[in-house]
């Protein structure tokens, strides 16, 4: 029985996994070949990244593998970063290859191949594991599955969402191009506004995620009557954990949020528009779910931060503060 890994729009099943003793032998040879790519201060973290990739109890998801590759690239000396290469053999988003080349740039030391529904990891030509992705079911439209393909973007030095694939039951797959998301970022770059846009969007997007987590937990614990002050404290403490301050000045009217970019790109596609019209009862909730999923991936590609993890942090923070408040109230009642 295959092991299922991951959540969200993609779940993975292990098809092939090498024995641990074989993995250890390959890892030792790999580490000897690449350890000098890193400064002494980065070697320990690079070693941990490789261990997570190759020895984790559960094989990393597609997204985590991508993160590890780019973390290793960031840790490498500037003179060695050219060895960390992203290759699109078909010049589309059907296949992305992330690879580390040897000193002569002739042989692949590490290769991560990501196809539409499978991804694999090879060490010096030896297959470490092969995983199969299966699209997740849309919560708002249970008769449909969704998958978001990605293509490497030089602007963010990370794969960005490039195609949305929707598969309605008993109907052909609907492919919606998302390339114009990168176009928005390129426009900001060309104007010289990209850094300012990023600083503004990071704070705005995460604040919205934190607020969403607070509201979600408040709804779940509606019987507990969580006070406004507890909710506000949870919001501020989560913002502080993320190194953010509460926004005193709203974004300028020229600022285009990620969610607006994504929505405009989706609705610019006439086929997608027509598809929404065919089922008006669920179209808005489905659109909102898809926009959030794509936006989260765009944000993650730009900032290397998982917005869902931040939202979860806010949920846990509110629960913790509420429980603490209840305990203190109980102690006070006992004292009185």
From Swiss-Prot:
GO (cellular component) term, any one: host cell cytoplasm
Chief location bin: secreted
Compartments, as annotated in UniProt: Secreted; Host cytoplasm; Host cell membrane
Keywords: Host cell membrane, Host cytoplasm, Host membrane, Membrane, Secreted, Virulence
InterPro entries xrefs: Sif, SifA_C_sf
Region Interaction with host PLEKHM2, residue ranges: 1-330
Superkingdom of origin: Bacteria
Written domain comment of the UniProt record: Domains throughout the protein, and not only the N-terminus, are required for secretion and translocation. Both N- and C-terminal domains are also required for formation of tubules.
Function according to Swiss-Prot or TrEMBL: Effector proteins function to alter host cell physiology and promote bacterial survival in host tissues. This protein is required for endosomal tubulation and formation of Salmonella-induced filaments (Sifs), which are filamentous structures containing lysosomal membrane glycoproteins within epithelial cells. Sif formation is concomitant with intracellular bacterial replication.
Similarity section: Belongs to the Sif family.
Protein name (Swiss-Prot/TrEMBL): Secreted effector protein SifA
Species this protein is from: Salmonella typhimurium (strain LT2 / SGSC1412 / ATCC 700720)
Organism placement in taxonomy: Bacteria, Pseudomonadati, Pseudomonadota, Gammaproteobacteria, Enterobacterales
Gene coding for it: sifA
